[in-house]
């Protein structure tokens, strides 16, 4: 059986906003199975944003586990991520999951990797999935050279990735949080 492939998820922090967006394409081998999948969600009463890349069923398993950790740790994003990773590394079933999560709240943006790592990216920019390198390059250029807001940067970088990556489409889901904190621009 072939694996489901690809997606692109981008998260940007700028000003008092954090935004996560993703495309809607699900691909099996060389066939597009679905074009309007929703890979970005709000969790914990809308206070946490999360997006996934990788095998869809695996990602839903991780979403459920992560959401239960968020509840258990009263919305503490970092603690919930670390506890999820502990489970991931010790549970035989979880160790086989092929997915990445990009998560963010008003304080932090994190990547939970397929190896069971928690990574805080430089400059509040996350890009994962098959189109991630294209979207990251575009988002970084926009952060460094424009005054665009976080939502516009996420949208434009996803569209650029969709123009280049065959596993990414232009059917976008974008969620944003107002953080009340001011994030510096890349310099």
Swiss-Prot record:
Keywords: Allosteric enzyme, Cytoplasm, Hydrolase, Metal-binding, Protease, Sodium, Threonine protease. Protease subunit of a proteasome-like degradation complex believed to be a general protein degrading machinery. The keyword Nucleus does not apply. Allosterically activated by HslU binding. GO terms for biological process: proteolysis involved in protein catabolic process. This is ATP-dependent protease subunit HslV. One of its GO terms (cellular component) is proteasome core complex. The gene is hslV. Its EC number is 3.4.25.2. The keyword Protease applies. Belongs to the peptidase T1B family. HslV subfamily. It catalyses: ATP-dependent cleavage of peptide bonds with broad specificity. It is found in: Cytoplasm. It comes from Methylococcus capsulatus (strain ATCC 33009 / NCIMB 11132 / Bath).
